[in-house]
From Swiss-Prot:
The UniProt record lists the keyword Hydrolase: yes
Lineage: Bacteria, Bacillati, Actinomycetota, Actinomycetes, Mycobacteriales
Species for this entry: Mycobacterium sp. (strain JLS)
Pfam entry (one): Acylphosphatase
Active site (UniProt): 23, 41
EC number: 3.6.1.7
The name this protein goes by in its record: Acylphosphatase
Key word Hydrolase present: yes
Gene designation per UniProt: acyP
Domain of life: Bacteria
């Protein structure tokens, strides 16, 4: 039985998500789920979250991002799915 291929979740998080510990919180949740990737502040106020791992764990992270228990205030999350394109080690704040 072969392992499921890894997927890549790219989530654009809109709202009051900078300067409130959002990237740190996201990193902690991603590491708990065994995901790799990063969370980065963008000049327009969004946070870009890139996570790679199993589809199930990436979906769990997306649910947490949309769930309302994050630091700050999330107004919406736009998610894009693709195959894991590169090898990423760890989960980092950028």
């Amino acid at each position: 039985m072969s392992a499921e291929p890894e997927v890549r979740l790219t989530a654009w998080v809109h709202g009051r998500v900078q300067g409130v510990g959002f990237r740190w919180w996201t990193r902690s949740r991603a590491l708990e789920l065994g995901l790799t990737g990063f969370a980065a502040n963008k000049p327009d106020g969004r946070v870009q979250v890139v996570a790679q791992g199993s589809r199930e764990e990436c979906e769990r992270l997306l649910g947490l991002l949309e769930g309302g228990d994050t630091p700050g205030r999330v107004d919406k999350v736009i998610a894009d799915w693709s195959d894991a394109r590169e090898q990423i080690t760890g989960f980092h704040e950028r």
